[in-house]
Amino acid sequence: MQNLICYKELPVWTAQTIPQGFKNQHNTKAGTWAKLKIYQGELSFAFLDEAGQVQSEHLFTPEQQPPFIEPQAWHKIVSTSDDIECLLQFCCTPQDYLNKKYQLSPTHSEILAATPYLHGGRALDVGCGQGRNSLYLSQQGFEVDAWDVNPQSLQKLQQIINAEGIQNIHVQQRDLNTDPSITGTYDFICCTVVMMFLEAPTVKPLIAQMQQATNVNGFNLIVCAMDTDDIPVQPDFPFAFKAGELKALYEGWNIVKYNENVGELHRVDEQGNRIKQHFATLLAQKLGV
C-alpha cells in the first residue's frame, strides 16, 4: 500500500461531528482506499457484506490504527468513546491521483491499454476535454499538446496544470471543423470519443493530418462511435464510422489493435440504462517507407 497517494483529507472529527452517513452501511468508490487515523479515544468499526451483515468487528485506538479500507468494501463506524478525535483520508494509485483529486472522468481504458506500447516523446490529445488523458500521458513522461474547442474545459485543465506545477502539458483552443491542420510531429496522437462530435467532412482530412504528423514507429489511437445495422448511430452525432471504414484508412500501418465492439455512452435512455453503441477502436503504428 506504500504507493497510494492521499487526494482528499476531511477535517478532524469528534464524537459530535462524525457524519451520520459514516455510521450507516456505506462503501468507497472503485479505485478509492479509505484510511482512518485515530488521534485519541476509541472507535468501534465493522466490516459488512452487501446485505449489511457484520463480517468482523474491530476496536481501533491511537496504538491500534485501522488498516486501509479496500475500494468498494462495505463498512460502518459502530460507536466511539466520548473523547474520540479521528480523521479520514481518501487515497488512490498515482495514475488516478489527478482524476480523483479534481473529479475528472477516469483515463480512457484504451489509453491505459496502449501504455505498454508507448515510450514517451511528444503526444497530441485531440479533443482533450478537461484533460483526463493528457494528465495521464504527462505522468508517463510525454510532452503533451492538449487541444479542445471548449474554453471552459481548457480553463479547468489549465487550473490543474497551474495548481500542480505541471510543465509538460500545453493547452490550445482549436476548432477542428474550421482548421484540422497539425503542424508539429508526434510519437503518439490520440482521439478518443471525439470524432462523432465533428462535422462529417472534417474527419478524414483530420485523420490524414494525424497520420502525416506521426513520427515513424509512432502510434495513433482512435475510438469513435459507429453506425451499424443492429445499432444505428445516435441521431445527434454528426459523424460515425461504417464497418471496416476506420481500419481501411490505416492501410500500410501496423494494426496493433482493431475492433468494433459494443460499448456504452455516458448518456442514458428513458429507463436510466447507459445507451449502447458499436465503437471502432484502433491502435496503429506508423511504419517506415
Spans of features found by a protein language model:
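Ligand-binding loop in jelly-roll beta-barrel domains
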Residues: 70-92
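A short glycine-rich, Lys/Arg-flanked "PGG" loop and its adjoining helix->strand segment in the class I
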Residues: 204-216
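Class I (Rossmann-like) S-adenosyl-L-methionine-dependent methyltransferase catalytic domain
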Residues: 23, 74, 92-118, 124, ...
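A short acidic, Gly/Pro-enriched loop at the edge of an enzyme's catalytic core
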Residues: 181-189
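Conserved short histidine dyad/triad with adjacent acidic residue
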Residues: 12-31
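Short acidic-glycine-tyrosine-enriched beta hairpin
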Residues: 51-71
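A short beta-strand submotif of the Rossmann-like class I SAM-dependent methyltransferase core
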Residues: 191-194
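Short, conserved beta-strand element in jelly-roll/cupin
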Residues: 34-44
